[in-house]
């Protein structure tokens, strides 16, 4: 049985699929050369630092992590064979049968290699991956990974950490699929690029709702040969997506290019929904979803697991966690300093969970005493800190190379996740970590994706741009004032309690403490009812409590690290969320 056997890319699904997760040979060496011997077996897709990998070793900067296995290509004849990696942290080279297939840099983004011409006509094939990860010694996106974990920073992880798979495709296959719904026009535009660009592409598309075909275009018009079609959604089949009704349309797309080129078919889905930031009936700026003001009430989600670090134990575990989030009455998760495997976003799409997506922080080393601790203590002053290259250097972006690297990572993130309806806001920077020229980042995001709000600088070093006035507040009285932007309390709370019966932290970390379940419940409910709720009528429109789960030493989650227990009383949490929603509805009424 393969770990994580589910098809890993729900937004572009094919029937041909061979999962390569499972035991591989591994070795950690000081050289990029093929190892003379193997150190043992590693369970892919778990990083060697993770218990679930069976290895339990930390890859150091400068070392090489080697993987090796044999494989049989997908059944069938002809066409091309593609090798997909969900993510490899950070840089890797890939060889098939001793010949270079390609490589990749970037620890959070998928990549694909066409290995057809490297395959043996008969027998088994060999696959070798050599990876390196500089962690904190580089400038690449790394999130909260560190070689010296503690407090709010967690163990580094390296190498393959998402599913590896093969598929057989036609000679001229669909390389990229872009699906652009238009809520106001009641349409969806489908565009493909194929592996052999430049020629005519005869495209067809079928939209289904609840298994019933509601729109189709079979590529009969000359206009369809440019690889793009637009389909109309009739009024009787118009079902907007929202947390209360997360309706997804099924989409099947194909190309018809004759026997030589083959016929490619992929399956996808989409939703119709519209985000706006505008004034409510009382002139206060709010988030609007599908023309209605909405309270975004959620949790900070860091995406770590006790045995797998970045990689979950199973798809069912992910789905269960997200179901519980909805059952508790939350409609938002802020995905913090990490990009998840695509199936995580797919489950959010299905369950109606809105996601605020952080760009994964990187850059050179920055002094945490200044960037986080001093800045937190002097928030009003730091919000006015002058922008420019001097500050960028303090924040780890002194080099032009690092800034260019961030621009590529930002574009890759939007390309990888932009088609998921659950994504409700982009967050280019958090608390100044690797921040530079935030206004430009916002402009870039709006050019890449004009359909979503931007929280330009979550926490501090605010430049006044974007759509959100984003506040982190753990220690001070909360005073919300009307703003030209929509106001979000994008981090707060963080009450720590190490729940008995679960693995204790090395050192308890949080923002305030509780001594029992009853005390944690009381502190949480008092914070929400007495501090947060009165601010809703003053303009507070989004809440992100810290946090969803315990993570390593940070025991301030609503769930335990292993997700087996909810720490505060679940009924009390639901009741508080209902009270917040009721107060918000009163606040936005004319």
Question: What is the meaning of each model-derived region?
Answer:
Residues 1-347, 351-355, 409, 424-425, ...:
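Secreted/periplasmic carbohydrate-active enzymes, especially glycoside hydrolases
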């Amino acid at each position: 049985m393969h770990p994580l056997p589910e098809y890993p890319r729900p937004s572009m699904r094919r029937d041909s699929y061979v999962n390569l997760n499972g035991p591989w040979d591994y070795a950690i060496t000081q050289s990029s050369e093929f190892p003379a011997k193997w150190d043992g077996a590693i369970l892919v897709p778990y990083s060697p630092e993770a218990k679930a990998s069976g290895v339990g070793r930390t890859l150091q900067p400068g070392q090489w992590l080697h993987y090796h296995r044999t494989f049989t290509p997908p059944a069938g004849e002809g066409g091309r064979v593609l090798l997909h990696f969900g993510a490899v942290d950070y840089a890797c080279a890939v060889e098939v049968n001793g010949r270079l297939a390609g490589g990749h840099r970037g620890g959070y983004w998928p990549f694909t290699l066409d290995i057809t011409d490297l395959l043996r006509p008969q027998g088994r094939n060999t696959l070798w991956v050599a990876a390196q990860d500089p962690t904190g010694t580089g400038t690449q996106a790394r999130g909260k990974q560190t070689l010296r974990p503690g407090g709010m920073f967690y163990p580094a992880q390296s190498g393959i950490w998402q599913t590896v798979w093969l598929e057989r495709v036609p000679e001229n296959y669909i390389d990229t699929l872009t699906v652009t719904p238009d809520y106001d026009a009641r349409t969806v535009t489908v565009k493909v690029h194929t592996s052999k660009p430049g020629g005519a592409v005869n495209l067809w598309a079928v939209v289904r709702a609840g298994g019933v075909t509601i729109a189709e275009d079979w590529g009969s018009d000359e206009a369809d040969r440019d690889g793009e079609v637009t389909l109309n959604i009739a009024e009787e089949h118009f079902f907007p997506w929202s947390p209360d009704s997360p309706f997804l349309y099924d989409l099947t797309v194909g190309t018809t290019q004759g026997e030589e080129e083959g016929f490619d078919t992929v399956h996808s889905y989409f939703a119709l929904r519209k985000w706006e930031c505008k004034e409510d009936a009382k002139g206060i700026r709010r988030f609007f979803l599908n023309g209605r003001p909405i309270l975004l009430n959620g949790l900070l989600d860091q995406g770590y697991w006790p045995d797998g670090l970045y990689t979950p134990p199973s798809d069912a575990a992910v789905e269960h966690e997200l179901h519980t989030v909805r059952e508790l009455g939350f409609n938002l998760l802020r995905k913090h300093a990490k990009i998840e495997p695509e199936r995580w976003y797919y489950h959010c799409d299905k369950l109606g969970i809105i996601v605020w997506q952080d760009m994964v922080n990187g850059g050179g080393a920055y002094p945490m005493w200044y960037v986080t601790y001093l800045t937190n203590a002097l928030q009003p002053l730091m919000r006015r800190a002058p922008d420019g290259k001097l500050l960028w250097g303090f924040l780890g972006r002194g080099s032009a190379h690092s800034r260019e690297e961030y621009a590529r990572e930002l574009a890759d993130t939007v390309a990888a996740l932009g088609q998921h309806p659950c994504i409700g806001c982009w967050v280019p920077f958090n608390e100044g970590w690797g921040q530079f020229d935030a206004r430009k980042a916002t402009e870039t995001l709006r050019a890449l994706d004009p359909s979503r709000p931007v929280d330009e600088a979550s926490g501090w070093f605010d430049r006044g741009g974007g759509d959100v006035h984003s506040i982190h507040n753990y220690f001070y009285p909360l005073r919300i004032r009307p703003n030209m932007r929509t106001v979000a309390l994008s981090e707060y709370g963080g009450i720590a309690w190490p729940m008995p019966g679960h693995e204790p932290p090395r050192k308890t970390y949080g923002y305030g403490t509780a001594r029992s379940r009853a005390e944690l419940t009381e502190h949480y409910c008092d914070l929400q009812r007495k501090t947060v709720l009165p601010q809703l009528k003053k303009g507070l429109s989004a809440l992100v409590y810290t946090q969803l789960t315990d993570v390593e030493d940070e025991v301030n989650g609503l769930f335990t690290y292993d997700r087996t227990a909810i720490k505060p009383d679940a009924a009390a949490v639901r009741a508080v969320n209902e009270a917040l929603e009721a107060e918000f509805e009163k606040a936005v009424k004319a």
